Amino acid sequence: MAAAPEAPATPKRPLVAIIDSGIARTPELSKFLVAEYDFGATPARAAFQPRYDHGTMVATIMEREAKAPIDIVSFRIDDLQGCPDDANPPCQHDVRPIAEAIRKATALGVTAINISLNLKEDPRIVDAVRDAAARGIKVVMAAGNDGLDHPGNLGMARAGYPNTILVGALDASGQPWKGTNKPQADATGYRYAWQWGVDVPTIMADGSQAVATGTSFAVPIETAKLLTEPKPATIALSS
């Protein structure tokens, strides 16, 4: 008697790392969150209980934009000391937690890393991004909200090219938001994408409705889009 054919394997969901302020386990996100690592405090703070809304808002936008179910692993990096009065959370004065979060995400073999932060051009972060991108991981980063004619996070974008992407924000009419750091006239050596980033509907950590503006909130839309692309081949690192 012939054996019955085996049922096809269930496709594995894309695993996405969100390096941010931590993510709340809201009813909408609960079935997508698989783990949270706290690189901003020792001992680690309680998982999925963020101080700030930012990471939850980013994760919600990404989940809504994804064409198929995804798994999200949260990397919480916000400083225990909070933010200066003139800064928007999440803040982290030390580059080490951010670099370590990128390396942990790389070790987990995630499909993409979402970084809706304005990072310091520190060699530890640049090297961590380069290594992630060399392993075929898409690293998607905010271009920044300073209204400049060049993007932030540029060193990282060049280091991981072509698997790193900077994202600027468009308004609902498709025009660049006034606060976006725009690509240079000659954008050779890095990728820059535009996505909706003005008054984007989302959810705060307490589950309440909100709208969000800034390149931070354009990034998860681009990340979700890139999840449908084939994973690129790894890149040989030069010695």
Located regions from the model:
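Active-site core segment of subtilase-fold serine proteases
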Residues: 2-93, 97-100, 104-108, 112, ...
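Structural recognition of the beta-strand scaffold that forms the well-ordered cores
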Residues: 15-19, 71-76, 111-116, 138-142, ...
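Glycine-rich, phosphate-binding/catalytic loops in enzymes
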Residues: 28, 32-37, 129-133, 156-159, ...
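Anion (oxyanion) recognition and catalysis
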Residues: 10, 133-134, 194
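Extracellular S/T/G-rich loop segment that most often corresponds to the catalytic His/Ser-adjacent loop
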Residues: 14, 20-22, 156-231
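Solvent-exposed loop/turn segments at secondary-structure junctions
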Residues: 22-25, 68, 78-82, 118-122, ...
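Substrate-binding/access-modulating region of protease and related hydrolase catalytic domains
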Residues: 81-160, 207-219
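An often Trp-containing, charged/polar helix-loop segment at the C-terminal end
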Residues: 231-239
